[in-house]
């Protein structure tokens, strides 16, 4: 009789210990597959043409990067979503940033000029100025040339 009670107690303890508790259940239950994909960050800016890079940063090719403006208010909601997101292109900078627009590297807190993010603008030589270059591209080329000149000395 005591052996039967001991066996039932062990089985009961085993059943309780393998339960899925509220605080550690994956979405869809114990047998759900883990989420492997990282979603794209929320859209922001005028006519939703940008992506959130942080709670106060919105960047897009057509608009550049907006920081702390009313257009970035929507990005604050990104902190309340449970799934992680990733905005931008390739990794850049020393603080875990990603290329936001041509020549700019942004993380969740700030943006900085980065020559790794120049993309197609980098392939143009400084003497090859064409008539269809936008003012932004010209400014980025000048910034790149000035930072390159400072690092050589």
Curated annotation (Swiss-Prot):
Protein name: Vasotocin-neurophysin VT 1
Keywords: Amidation, Cleavage on pair of basic residues, Disulfide bond, Hormone, Secreted, Signal
Disulfide bonding pattern of the chain: 20-25, 41-85, 44-58, 52-75, 59-65, 92-105, 99-117, 106-111
PTM remark: Seven disulfide bonds are present in neurophysin.
Species: Takifugu rubripes (Japanese pufferfish)
Keyword Secreted among UniProt keywords: yes
Subcellular compartments: Secreted
PANTHER family attached to this UniProt entry: NEUROPHYSIN, VASOPRESSIN-NEUROPHYSIN 2-COPEPTIN PRECURSOR
Residues with the Glycine amide modification: 28
Transcription as UniProt keyword: no
Name of one Pfam family that matches: Hormone_5
Signal peptide: 1-19
């Amino acid at each position: 009789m005591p052996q039967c009670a001991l066996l039932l107690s062990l089985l009961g303890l085993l059943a309780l210990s393998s339960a899925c508790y509220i605080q550690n259940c994956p979405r869809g239950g114990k047998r759900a597959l883990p989420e492997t994909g990282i979603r794209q960050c929320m859209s922001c800016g005028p006519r939703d043409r940008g992506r959130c890079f942080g709670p106060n940063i919105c960047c897009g090719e057509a608009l550049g990067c907006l920081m702390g403006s009313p257009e970035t208010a929507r990005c604050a909601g990104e902190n309340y979503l449970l799934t992680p997101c990733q905005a931008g292109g390739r990794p850049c900078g020393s603080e875990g940033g990603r290329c936001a627009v041509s020549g700019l590297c942004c993380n969740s807190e700030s943006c900085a000029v980065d020559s790794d993010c120049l993309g197609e603008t980098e392939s143009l030589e400084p003497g090859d100025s064409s008539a269809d270059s936008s003012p932004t591209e010209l400014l980025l080329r000048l910034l790149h040339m000035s930072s390159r000149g400072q690092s050589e000395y």
